[in-house]
Swiss-Prot record:
UniProt similarity note: Belongs to the bacterial ribosomal protein bL21 family.
PANTHER family hit by this protein: 50S RIBOSOMAL PROTEIN L21, LARGE RIBOSOMAL SUBUNIT PROTEIN BL21M
Protein's gene: rplU
Annotated Pfam families: Ribosomal_L21p (PF00829)
Keywords: Ribonucleoprotein, Ribosomal protein, RNA-binding, rRNA-binding
GO cellular component: cytoplasm; ribonucleoprotein complex; ribosome
GO biological process: translation
Keyword Methyltransferase listed: no
Protein known as: Large ribosomal subunit protein bL21
Domain of life: Bacteria
GO function term, MF aspect, one: structural constituent of ribosome
Subunit structure: Part of the 50S ribosomal subunit. Contacts protein L20.
Function: This protein binds to 23S rRNA in the presence of protein L20.
Amino acid sequence: MYAIIKNGGKQYKVQEGDILLFDRMTLEPKATFEIKEVLAVNAGELKMGAPFLEGAVVTAEVINEGRDKKVITFKKRRRKDSKVKRGFRRDYTRVRITKIAA
């Protein structure tokens, strides 16, 4: 059984027990929450929403919060001293999917 969920403008294909990295959420570790934006569920038969399935809920548990590795962006043009180097670290929340209810 799997589900396709939407969180933070991104879509994820999840199964029970999966561990995902979501954008930072203001929840404590070990807290559980429900994701109601379920786009599709496959439990032997595929059910699609338009855009979301009514009554379908995915339950998840927060494991921890952290920061990703630094992503370097470098832009260089052919003129003298025409370069820019920037770094970015994404804040994330690590989440475990505990239950899929269709």
